């Protein structure tokens, strides 16, 4: 047994709870040990909405078989509808302890409210090997299967379903808002946003949209594939990260919605001129900042791939390594990542990830909060742009879309600015430096080298020396 310094994702039950907490009218029952009911506290601390998480705990403990006290699963499922009459769907999540107990799921019938009884979604695919992200994806598919009705007539004007991240996703609400703004810009409305903020009734209206836009493939993959097979709904999977990726996604949406390509292109150009800072940043910044710079990227799926495309093709950085911790998406990830890097990998052990990053010898690390220590040990800048991240800001900013490209440009400016190469320490008057003095100057942080050089040369003039030696350089710093 080995002690890990962290994990990238939680158990499958946590993914189910995240999806349930993202939606309206859905209540989750967590079958787990009494000490595992931490989700409501985590939800309150992260979301800050003032509302309780729609999660109830059914404690797993020894009791008489005919007991109807707390912990009886059938009773706990039935009581949810009684205590929360607004519930339209109940989803059952089981912890690893509950799964290993191998108890049977009871048959429960809910009373009708307003002529309609809530549905019970049991997630029969659960097993200890399914992680948080995959479980969230499968849980959303189960909810869509249970509530998506027959093929509805398409809306008169073009509309799209947005499938994005659930709660706890960094900047999740901001990502939806940016995508909705961009779709409105090209003349496409939003039919519904799934799962964040969607109601059970919204799931029944999914088939009325013209296209499904997959912002976050990790959670919407299975649901959109079901809608594609069942109702023939086409989907757009291009990551909206960076200016080029956003433009490609908008043009694809325009084609599927039969929009005028010239108007779509005009809208894209307008955003490039008005909002997107990344292309301008890449062209107007000093070339030395990007030349032969290597970046290592690690995260979930959408963000590492989107950032890999943007940093390699728009900024000009060399992607030394790109990896994910999602083993169930390994084939798709490697297929896409190999288009911009030779070193693509799948790994969920933080120590192995650290070793991979160190071996790639990067100048910049982009990843989850677990990669910050690796960047510190290498002495290179770190950008926490891929989930999971522990920093939760009050003001959410998107990383997708043209607004997100400006956020990315600002982050790169802060990170790469510390790596700017100072010119060789040569004074206008021609004062030379010894080799040892140059080596000492090279060990000075880049943003302090200019001042250190001037102080050393002033000190040499005061001492009447014709060159800057190691002793003069060290003496000038006192």
Q: What are these model-predicted stretches?
A:
Residues 1-430:
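An N-terminal assembly and electron-transfer interface module characteristic of large anaerobic redox
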Residues 424-478:
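Non-catalytic accessory segments flanking P-loop/AAA+ NTPase cores
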């Amino acid at each position: 047994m080995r002690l890990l310094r962290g994990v990238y994702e939680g158990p499958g039950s946590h993914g189910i709870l995240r999806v349930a907490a993202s939606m309206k009218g859905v209540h989750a029952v967590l079958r787990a040990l009494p000490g595992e009911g931490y989700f409501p506290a985590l939800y309150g601390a992260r979301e800050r909405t003032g509302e309780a998480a729609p999660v109830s705990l059914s404690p797993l403990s020894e009791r008489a078989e005919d007991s109807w006290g707390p912990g009886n699963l059938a009773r706990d499922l039935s009581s949810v509808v009684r205590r929360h009459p607004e519930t339209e769907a109940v989803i059952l999540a089981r912890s690893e302890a509950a799964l290993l107990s191998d108890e049977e799921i009871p048959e429960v019938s809910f009373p009708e409210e307003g002529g309609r009884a809530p549905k019970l979604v049991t997630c029969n695919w659960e097993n200890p090997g399914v992680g948080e992200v995959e479980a969230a994806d499968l849980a959303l598919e189960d909810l869509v299967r249970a509530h998506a009705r027959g093929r509805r007539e398409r809306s008169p004007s073009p509309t799209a379903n947005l499938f994005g991240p659930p709660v706890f996703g960094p900047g999740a609400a901001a990502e939806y808002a940016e995508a909705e703004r961009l779709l409105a810009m090209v003349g496409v409305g939003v039919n519904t946003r799934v799962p964040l903020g969607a109601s059970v009734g919204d799931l029944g209206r999914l088939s009325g949209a013209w296209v499904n836009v997959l912002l976050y493939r990790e959670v919407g993959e299975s649901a959109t594939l079901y809608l594609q097979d069942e109702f023939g709904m086409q989907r757009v999977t291009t990551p909206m990260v960076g200016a080029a990726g956003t433009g490609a996604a908008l043009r694809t949406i325009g084609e599927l919605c039969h929009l005028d390509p010239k108007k779509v292109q005009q809208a894209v150009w307008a955003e490039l001129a008005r909002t997107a800072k990344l292309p301008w940043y890449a062209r107007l910044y000093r070339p030395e900042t990007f030349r032969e710079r290597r970046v290592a990227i690690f995260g979930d799926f959408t963000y590492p791939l989107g950032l890999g495309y943007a940093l390699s093709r728009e900024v000009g950085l060399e992607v030394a390594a790109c990896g994910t911790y999602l083993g169930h998406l390994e084939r798709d990830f490697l297929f896409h990542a190999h288009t911009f890097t030779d070193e693509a990998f799948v790994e969920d052990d933080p120590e192995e990830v650290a070793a991979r990053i160190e071996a790639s010898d990067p100048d910049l690390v982009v990843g989850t909060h677990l990669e910050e220590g690796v960047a510190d040990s290498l002495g290179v800048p770190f950008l926490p742009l891929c989930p999971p991240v522990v920093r939760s800001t009050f003001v959410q900013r998107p990383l997708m879309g043209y607004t997100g490209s400006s956020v990315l440009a600002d982050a790169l400016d802060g990170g790469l600015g510390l790596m700017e190469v100072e010119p060789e320490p040569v004074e206008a008057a021609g004062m030379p430096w010894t080799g040892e003095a140059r080596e000492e100057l090279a060990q000075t942080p880049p943003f302090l080298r200019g001042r250190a050089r001037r102080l050393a040369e002033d000190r040499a003039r005061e001492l009447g020396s014709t060159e800057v030696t190691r002793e003069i350089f060290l003496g000038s710093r006192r």
